[in-house]
Amino acid sequence: LIILAGRPGMGKTALATNIAYNAASVFRQEKDEHGNVTAEHGAQVGFFSLEMSAEQLATRILAERSEISSEKLRRGELSDPDFSKVVRASQEIESMPLYIDDTPALTVAGLRARARRLKRQHGLSLIVVDYLQLMRPSSSARLNNRVQEVSEITQGLKALAKELNVPVIALSQLSRAVEQRDDKRPQLSDLRESGSIEQDSD
């Protein structure tokens, strides 16, 4: 379980999207004569976006890969060369093992069920969750204490990483405390509802 933390607007999603794209873009498997996988490069990625819709995320990836601003893409203001770039980039993205799930307010149990299905149907070697604080604990464990809820979520993600034997990158918000200090470098204690996050993450 890897935690990628930052204050809002600092580029957590952009970095996570980049990691996911780059891992998926180089994915390939080497097999022996019996068809057994002997080596794997890159990753089959499950991106669980609780903040942005799949469409927003895809537009962001497409804009970055085609080197055309997402504003231009949204408005459809594309020249012929721009359009060709977009078509090329979208074909490239479509062929990648990058699966986006934008179900809002997912519980750990819901995420686990989706990840298991993804692994069974397509294969899965990396999970990205954007972001931790938007997840909900399982309905049976709805608690009044948010710290305990986050603890249940991080423990669930850690267990999922072990069960499926895949790394889980979970994005997390930092508290405002980091902005009050002269030294703005984040510390583990700046993680929102921090105790369990620093305890459960690798």
Language-model features, listed with the residues they occupy:
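Conserved lysine of the Walker
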Residues: K12
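Hydrophobic positions on the alpha1 helix immediately C-terminal to the Walker A/P-loop
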Residues: L15, I19, L57
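Short hydrophobic/aromatic beta-strand immediately N-terminal to the Walker A/P-loop
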Residues: I2-I3, G46
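Phosphate-binding/switch region of NTP-binding enzymes
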Residues: Q148-D202
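Cytosolic-facing regulatory segments adjacent to core modules
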Residues: S25-G123, P137
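Conserved P-loop NTPase nucleotide-binding/switch module
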Residues: R60-E67, L132-K158, R181-P186
